[in-house]
A protein has these predicted regions:
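All-alpha prenyltransferase/terpene-synthase fold signal
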Residues: 1-181
Length: 181
């Protein structure tokens, strides 16, 4: 299960590296440090994000599960990062002028959280479907909290630029529901 968790973290880091690129958020910092494209160049950031995705699946290949369990785990994790349900879909929604906020949150963040809960269950030999809703709900809650932080925090408080959602016209809970919800 540690290998599955590490693979999901590699995918999460890849999504952050890609999200910070100039074609998306053009973030100067991440976690209080220069973003990868600012520190090393845009081409190297793109390749680094891609390499993290490959590394995640190479890491999963090290698991010594039975083939059925491995197949289910690969499907769950690849779905969380792909389209039409995963991180790729969530990133694509940011390019659209009108977006259903719940669908966007489920794709952008809920899919990865769901993969974490489901993959943990599958790796332990349990039924992953029983854990899907928990992951989706945690992901949506996290994304709403992140939307609030983007609107109400300072860069020093959260270690990354703020106000990006509003400046870029991105879907977010504040824009749709207001600060008081």
């Amino acid at each position: 299960t540690d290998i599955a968790a590490a693979s999901i973290e590699f995918l999460h880091c890849a999504s952050l590296v890609h999200d910070d690129l100039p074609c998306f958020d053009d973030a100067a910092t991440r976690r209080g440090m220069p973003s990868v494209h600012r520190a090393f160049s845009e081409p190297l950031a793109l390749l680094s994000g891609d390499a993290l995705i490959v590394l995640a699946f190479q890491n999963l290949a090290r698991l010594s599960f039975n083939p059925q369990r491995m197949s289910a785990l690969l499907f769950m994790i690849s779905r969380a990062v792909g389209a039409p349900y995963g991180i790729v879909a969530g990133q694509a929604w940011e390019c659209e002028p009108q977006v259903d906020l719940a669908h966007y949150h489920r794709s952008k963040t809920g899919a990865l959280f769901s993969a974490a809960t489901c993959a943990g269950a599958a790796a332990a030999g349990s039924d992953p479907d029983r854990w899907r809703l928990l992951g989706e709900t945690l992901g949506e809650a996290y994304q709403v909290a992140d939307d609030l932080r983007d609107a109400l925090s300072t860069p020093d408080e959260i270690g990354k630029p703020v106000g990006k959602d509003e400046a870029l016209g991105r879907p977010n809970a504040i824009r749709s529901l207001g600060i008081d919800g």
